[in-house]
């Protein structure tokens, strides 16, 4: 009897959807190696492998059979995805065209030899970034350069603006996946895309105000409440939007955020917020570790860079990697909490993830432990351990959806004060 490798759902699934992977038709107790490979849009290969032993019936199910070693060990049904590593160091898995799936090739090899034995079975599976019926609408309106993702159907949907960080360009994968869960999501570029500024220093908050107005008047966006989600520099921009463009922004998710304005000064009308500086001489040899380089935003004169988040009207959800080495996200979340409470506001929701680094992505993305920083142009240590971060990404993804479902319900949120 020939071995068979089954993957469910069969043939295709959404990237954030778990898979059921099983092998049948092996000899009792047969040692095998499972291997996965994915090629990104620039041709880089990502790979993972794990050693297994079939049960007495010649079967193994990744949901019930622990890996004996390899890229991961233990019971990890999705390890063949999140444990993938690039062939080239510091390469990050990024989805550049969400209309085309990633194709994952899975193989079963005989034995536990490092170079692999005879191939016993093979399967190919497509991982899509747009659920059936999700619509992708390019937006080139006024100065706004973005893509709006709409769920299936003609109704109105809770609206979210999605910002990535200093990576620049237009990142659509998180927005496209969230649209599959019932949200109208605007993936917003703000520099290094088409005719937008090449440099982050030329971006003004009025640009984000224009994007907010666009969402509010869209016939398929359920007003009057809009949510924001941002990571890294995108997160402190979300904080600034919530603080200075506060009308109608009623729910903000901040992934490894700084409570101060970072990298470049912020301009809005007559407002000027300086950037929080850093001291690169504090870096040790080897990979650049930014965690201890940043100035303390509570000290003079750095406090001028603090974002007055207490002016925001809606609640916050802070998702914090405790091993973030780009900056002290855990410290900044505590500062935010103290500042809000000092102004009589409710405590924000803060979720701390141990052994989790800076780049918290949707589920099953391989955590980029170290990558080349798009602004600095150098290899930067992001922090995190793959197993722990894979769990954090799965938990964070559910919390993001729950948070937005709760607060983007078309009603004005109750204003709570503890004064």
Swiss-Prot record:
This is Acyl-coenzyme A thioesterase 6. Coiled coil: none annotated. The active site is at 232 (charge relay system), 324 (charge relay system), 358 (charge relay system). It catalyses: pristanoyl-CoA + H2O = 2,6,10,14-tetramethylpentadecanoate + CoA + H(+); phytanoyl-CoA + H2O = 3,7,11,15-tetramethylhexadecanoate + CoA + H(+). It comes from Mus musculus (Mouse). Induction: Up-regulated in liver upon treatment with peroxisome proliferator. Belongs to the C/M/P thioester hydrolase family. The lineage of its organism: Eukaryota, Metazoa, Chordata, Craniata, Vertebrata. Its EC number is 3.1.2.-. Pathway: Lipid metabolism; fatty acid metabolism. GO terms for biological process: acyl-CoA metabolic process; fatty acid metabolic process.
């Amino acid at each position: 009897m020939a071995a068979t490798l089954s993957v469910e759902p069969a043939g295709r699934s959404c990237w954030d959807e778990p898979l059921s992977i099983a092998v049948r038709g092996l000899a009792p107790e047969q040692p095998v190696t499972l291997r996965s490979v994915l090629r990104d849009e620039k041709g880089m290969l990502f790979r993972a492998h794990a050693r297994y032993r079939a049960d007495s019936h010649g079967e193994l199910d990744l949901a019930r059979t622990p890996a004996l070693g390899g890229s991961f060990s233990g019971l990890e049904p999705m390890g063949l995805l999140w444990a993938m590593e690039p062939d080239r160091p510091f390469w990050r898995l990024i989805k550049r065209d969400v209309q085309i799936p990633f194709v994952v090739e899975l193989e079963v090899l005989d034995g536990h030899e490092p170079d692999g034995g005879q191939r016993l079975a093979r399967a190919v599976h497509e991982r899509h970034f747009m659920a059936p019926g999700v619509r992708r609408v390019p937006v080139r309106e006024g100065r706004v350069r973005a893509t709006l993702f709409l769920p299936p159907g003609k109704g109105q949907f809770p609206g979210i603006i999605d910002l990535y960080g200093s990576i620049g360009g237009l990142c659509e994968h998180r927005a496209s996946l969230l649209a599959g869960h019932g949200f109208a999501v605007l993936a917003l570029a703000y520099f290094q895309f088409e005719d937008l500024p090449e440099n982050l220093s030329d971006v003004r908050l009025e640009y984000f105000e224009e994007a907010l107005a666009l969402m509010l008047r869209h016939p398929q966006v359920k007003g009057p409440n809009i949510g924001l989600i941002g990571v890294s520099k995108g997160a402190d921009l979300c904080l600034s939007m919530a603080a200075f463009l506060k009308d109608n922004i009623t729910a903000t998710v901040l992934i490894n955020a700084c409570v101060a304005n970072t990298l470049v000064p912020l301009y809005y009308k007559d407002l000027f917020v300086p950037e929080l500086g850093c001291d690169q001489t504090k870096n040790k040899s080897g990979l650049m570790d930014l965690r201890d380089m940043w100035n303390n935003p509570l000290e003079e004169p750095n406090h001028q860079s603090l974002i007055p988040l207490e002016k925001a009207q809606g609640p916050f959800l802070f998702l914090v990697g405790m091993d973030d080495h780009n900056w002290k996200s855990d410290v900044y979340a505590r500062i935010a909490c103290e500042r809000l409470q000092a102004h009589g506001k409710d405590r924000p929701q803060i979720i701390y993830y141990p052994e989790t680094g800076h780049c918290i992505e949707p589920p099953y993305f391989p955590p980029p432990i170290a990558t080349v920083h798009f602004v600095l142009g150098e290899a930067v240590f992001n922090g995190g351990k793959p197993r722990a971060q894979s769990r954090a990404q799965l938990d964070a993804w559910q919390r993001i959806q729950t948070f937005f479902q709760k607060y983007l319900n078309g009603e004005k949120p109750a204003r709570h004060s503890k004064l």
